[in-house]
Regions:
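Rossmann-like AdoMet
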Residues: 1-40
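S-adenosylmethionine/decaboxylated-SAM
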Residues: 32-220
């Protein structure tokens, strides 16, 4: 299937995004209120989209697909910034088994499949491999496991993958596990907070990567 023209692709993404938030996903996990609890709300998706556009992101890594709400917001941003070179790496080991590929189907329905790479592995393995391969991204969005050690590992590898001056955005900033993991990188590696609203938090990486001395450590 040939890629859609740029204007038609952007309109399709916006239509699929609007339908997802108006009517819900085609399929849901069997838990009451699951979509509303798990999916990135539309307003926060707009914030994510606008952040990526403002930073000119053309290549984005996403950890956690679920129902696809954040992926569609990222896809909309890439329609604006990326042109034919846009690339979206989506990592989610549970997309097929837990979500019956509903998020993947939303990306396909939006006409974004040709610029999206799906990785069905845990992020600690997938991100490590991408780093080993020398992959580089302009930005990342993190909404996978919220266990502290897993958020920390995601950020550890994304520090190597996102270019200097790039952007890392995380969902559920109010979770203590997420906030604590981010605080380490703020204090020890010079990440700078970017003002956002809602439930997201965003960090800009230093223009010159900071590598602390072997003995330097700031408690977090």
């Amino acid at each position: 299937m040939s890629p859609l023209p740029a204007d038609a692709r952007l309109q399709r993404v916006r239509t699929v995004r609007a339908e997802l938030h108006a009517s819900g996903p085609k399929r849901r996990r069997p838990f009451e209120g699951d979509f509303e609890r798990v999916a990135l709300p539309e307003a926060d998706g707009d914030v994510l989209r606008d952040l990526l556009v403002a930073h000119g992101a053309r290549t984005v890594i996403e950890v956690g697909l679920a129902y696809g709400s954040s992926a569609l917001a990222i896809g909309e941003a890439l329609c604006v910034t990326g042109g034919t070179d846009a690339s979206h790496i989506v990592i989610d080991p549970f997309q097929a088994t837990a979500y019956d590929d509903v998020g993947r189907d939303a990306i396909v329905a939006a006409g974004l499949a040709d610029r999206t790479t799906f990785i069905d592995e845990v992020s600690s393995i997938a991100l490590a491999r991408l780093a080993h391969e020398g992959f580089s991204a302009d930005a990342a969005f993190v909404d996978g496991s919220h266990r502290f050690h897993e958020v920390f590992v995601d950020l550890y590898f994304l520090r190597k993958l996102v270019r200097p001056g790039g952007l890392i955005v995380l969902d559920d900033a109010a979770w203590p596990s997420v906030a604590t993991a981010v605080r380490y990188f703020d204090l020890n590696l010079g990440w700078q907070a970017v003002t956002v609203g809602g439930r997201l938090t965003a960090r800009r990486l230093p223009d010159q990567p900071l590598e602390p001395s072997f003995t330097d450590f700031k408690p977090f």
